[in-house]
Design a protein with these regions (language model features):
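Extracellular ligand-binding/catalytic regions of CAZymes and related secreted enzymes
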Residues: 28-41, 59-60, 67-71, 237-340
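Catalytic beta-strand/loop cores that center a nucleophilic Ser/Cys/Thr
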Residues: 31, 69, 75, 94, ...
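Helical hinge/lid and interdomain linker segments adjacent to catalytic or ligand-binding clefts
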Residues: 29-35, 47-49, 53-146
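Sec/Tat signal peptide C-region and signal peptidase I cleavage site
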Residues: 23-27
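Bacterial N-terminal signal peptides
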Residues: 10-22
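Bacterial N-terminal signal peptides that target proteins for export
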Residues: 1-13
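Nucleotide donor/acceptor-binding cores
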Residues: 44
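A glycine-rich, often tryptophan-bearing local segment used as a flexible ligand/cofactor-contacting loop or short
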Residues: 111, 115-207
Length: 340
């Protein structure tokens, strides 16, 4: 064999080994990444953090990440609550979300947590992001993302949803309100999003004309005055979009459902904040809700003028979300199973 042929074969083998190594490394990552294609979001990085026991954020956030990356150009990294024993996604694990340090390079954080209590080393990265002036989108249970019941002496215990000193913790102080109650009858009364006519021309509502989801309306009774309500939540009498609104006090007045505000952290820099109390995996079957969250991602990252009413928010691959409920998550799923 000539030297030139041997070199070509050796180079090919080496390249193959490098690709295999990279593939194995990626498969072992406890998160999933979607590289942005061409689009307005190209060059910007969104970190989406899932971790709730009931509303299947571990299904919704990979779907959103795929849309934001493939349809709109953002690089998206999705983090999960992970069982450290086998590397599978375990929404019941409240203390382990690998990859939080990736927030250091993020341009936007999308959050769908519930009652987490992360180690201080991880919360340090979260805290730095919250105070950096960078934007945040909170979905559904993000208003009660944290519950410090084990380590109440942690410097980050103030993030707890029921904190008394930093009243209402992260939910109230950053997003605008903390968890109060189910305003609609959970599992029996669904939600119709009613656009606030005062804000009908807000960029986030571009192309949004219908929002409905099977989750109930949350009680939002102490929303900070600085919040700007874009959509109110109308309680429907049943679990179908055709059901009529409930009569009486539940809809008089309607609760805030989707709002924006600003938060100034310890850095002195101000963040754009978006929060909605919708956001279960089944809620995102609503094209209107998907569009509102995609538009919010543009708005949060300073791409307001790039928002289009005709941009695609179609699913990248078949989306059959699991209906909400405790203990209903799919066992044995690893982050790599969400890779494209």
């Amino acid at each position: 064999m000539c030297h030139r042929s041997f070199t070509r074969i050796a180079t090919a083998l080496l390249a193959g080994l490098i690709c295999m190594s990279a593939g194995l490394s990626q498969a072992a990552d406890p998160w999933v990444e979607y590289q942005g294609t061409e689009g307005p979001g190209k060059g910007k990085h969104i970190v989406l953090i899932s971790g709730d026991e009931e509303y299947r954020s571990e299904e919704a956030l990979p779907m959103l990440g795929q849309i934001l990356a493939i349809r709109h150009g953002f690089k998206c990294t999705v983090l999960f609550s992970i069982d450290p024993k086998d590397g599978t996604i375990d929404p019941k694990n409240q203390t382990n979300i690998p990859g939080i340090e990736k927030l250091a390079g993020a341009d936007l954080m999308i959050l769908a947590l519930r009652f987490r209590e992360l180690p201080d080393a991880d919360m340090k990265h979260f805290d730095q992001y919250v105070n950096s002036g960078k934007p945040i989108i909170g979905l559904r249970t993000a208003t009660h993302s944290f519950n410090y019941s084990r380590n109440k002496q942690s410097p980050f215990a103030k993030y707890s949803f029921n904190n008394g000193d930093w009243k209402g913790g992260f939910g109230r102080q950053v997003l605008g309100d903390t968890w109060i109650n189910h305003h609609g009858h959970h599992g029996r009364e669904s939600t119709r999003g009613v656009i606030n006519p005062k804000n009908a021309k807000h960029p986030i509502l571009t192309g949004v004309d219908d929002i409905w989801g099977p989750t109930d309306v949350y009680g939002v009774k102490n929303l900070l005055p600085s919040a700007n309500v874009l959509v109110h939540g109308q309680v429907l009498a049943g679990m179908k979009p055709s059901d009529k609104p409930v009569e009486g006090k539940k809809n008089q007045p309607m609760m805030p459902l989707f709002w924006t505000r600003e938060y100034t952290g310890t850095s002195g820099k101000t963040s754009r904040i978006v929060c909605t109390t919708m956001g279960a995996s089944v809620d995102f079957e609503s094209e209107g809700l998907r569009r509102a969250v995609v538009n919010a991602s543009y708005w949060c990252t300073g791409l307001d003028k790039q928002i289009s009413p005709t941009s695609s928010v179609d699913f990248i691959r078949e989306y059959k979300p699991t209906f909400f409920g405790f203990g209903k998550f799919k066992r044995g799923v690893k982050p790599s199973d969400h890779a494209l």
